[in-house]
Amino acid sequence: MAETRITADTAMNGQIEETTAWKDFLALIKVGIVYSNLITTFTGMWLAFYFSNLSFLGNLDIVLFTLAGSSLIIAGSCVINNFYDRDIDQLMQRTRTRPTVTGKIQPSQALWFGILLTALGFIMLLMTNLTAAGVGFVGVFTYVFLYTMWSKRRYTVNTIIGSVSGAVPPLIGWTAVQGSIGVEAWVLFLIMFIWQIPHFLALAIKKTEEYRAANIPMLPVVHGFEVTKRQIIIWIACLMPLPFFLGGLGLPIVILGTVLNIGWLVCGLVGYRSKNIMKWATLMFVYSLNYLTIFFVAMVVFTLFKIG
């Protein structure tokens, strides 16, 4: 796996980029997406233990099956996405070195590998309960079929559709413990669903020309920056009431969530009239990453000593 390989990046600058088999594997499964979704999966699972007064340490089998199963179905879905999108990935700077584009991994190999990972993930989730596996199926179906194969290349609402799948992980974590979806779990789902839209719209502004070259109808490509900026502000505003539904976690979490929401909204409004749209989009994108990490990690930390 440590064998060094060579990738020719000839389409843009003719330079040679060295990659390893391990690096190719991480790119194939989109390891960044796997990691970020595991944070929200773990948070959903942790809070399910918290609200049900169950022991975390006494249910390590559920913890391991949930995290392993979630990792596998997310990674498998990403591999299938790489397989399907290899024709447009070669047209975009940030995706053109993926192994499905460079030929490091053959399309058929990627497809079957993605299917295998996803199947193994479902088996792992079934070891917790049927509900968790069912929720996982909704996430996979939405991402692979409704987003990747149907809406991504056709409609500007592709971001909204894709955000459904990205909001599923905390529900997987929650249902793996409780077997049903509680109010707090739906709040986590809504936070993740709404959060993704301004997050990815900010990225779409930064990568507008790449999306245009690949003929992907992202909102800034079709309707321009002004419409996209307004949509970002509107979706951030929709986050404002959600922390108040997490009162069961304590006042500090409600305050933290509210402060994070206000901070993001203020950043958006202050920079809304900025002539440097790329600087503004970068600020919004970076803030969104910090928002997710801080808020979801804090929900675990603030309840850390209340779970056995």
UniProtKB/Swiss-Prot annotation:
Its main location: membrane. It is a multi-pass membrane protein. It is an enzyme of class 2 (transferase). Interacts with CtaA. Belongs to the UbiA prenyltransferase family. Protoheme IX farnesyltransferase subfamily. Carbon 2 of the heme B porphyrin ring is defined according to the Fischer nomenclature. Converts heme B (protoheme IX) to heme O by substitution of the vinyl group on carbon 2 of heme B porphyrin ring with a hydroxyethyl farnesyl side group. This is Protoheme IX farnesyltransferase. It comes from Bacillus licheniformis (strain ATCC 14580 / DSM 13 / JCM 2505 / CCUG 7422 / NBRC 12200 / NCIMB 9375 / NCTC 10341 / NRRL NRS-1264 / Gibson 46). The lineage of its organism: Bacteria, Bacillati, Bacillota, Bacilli, Bacillales. The gene is ctaB.
